[in-house]
Every structure is written in C-alpha cells, then in structure tokens.
Amino acid sequence: MEEIDKEWLEDVYNVDTGNLYKCTYPADLNYIGDNQEAYKNIMNNPETRAYDLSTNETEDNYSRLVDLIGILNLPVNANYPTYISTILNVESVLKSFAIDVATGNWDDYFYNKNNYYLYDNPATGRFEYFTFDTDNTFGVDWVNRDWAQRN
C-alpha cells in the first residue's frame, strides 16, 4: 500500500494543501465541544493524538475537524443528509465502509475507532474518508476470536 502523504493526496485529489488527519484509537468522532485543544488531547498525551494532523502541522488547526464532528453528532432529522453532505463526501465514507464489511476488516472505525484518515479537501470543501492499515482483514485473528464476524 502506498504511503498516505502529500504526494498521494496530489495523485488522488489533485490538491495537497488541505488538512490530513490520521485517526487512530480512540478517534470515535464524538463531539466534546468546540475547543480544538480537546480533540488534540483526547489521549492526555502530548506525544500522541487520536486525530493526528499529518499536513500543515505548523498551523495546527483543528477548527474544520471540530465542525465536521459537530455536524456528525447533530440530531437526525429530515435535514441531516443535507447538513452532513455539505462537509463530508458521504459517498467516500459509504464506499470505505462497504469494503471494510466485505473484507471483514474489524480493526477499523466501526469496532476500534481506528485506522482511518480524514482529508479536508480544499477543492470540494468537504472531508474525504478512507481506511488504512488493513492487515486485519479476511478473517485474520490475533486474539483467538472470530473478528471477521464482528462487522
């Protein structure tokens, strides 16, 4: 698998200037307020971030990520699809989720709140979602449990 970096973003999206967040446990997308620092320090460890900004590190800006998480946690009503599609490429999420389920990927957002990226694509103004680190798929079991049945 290719390394997810600015070169990869340029190849896939034709733009590499947006914020790329590497999301690892416990990146559960739960809204904990509008303070950016709260999302930077979920793990209470300044060396490790659940939402790790992998590009534009000097700006260290999490405001759009906080906006996304806030919208994801709105009460579901008739307007929810409109709200969410203004900030998230829903199709990219659904495709990734479908592949995760089809391959039995249990080490993902659904089960471990882990191993995904969010890219704030400046060309579209929406976040892209994609899975990474798919070594635990197709029934791979490292703790003597049938994780492929968990999805």
Please report, for each region that a protein language model flagged, where it lies by residue:
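Phosphate/dinucleotide-binding and metal-coordinating scaffold of catalytic cores
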Residues: 1-151
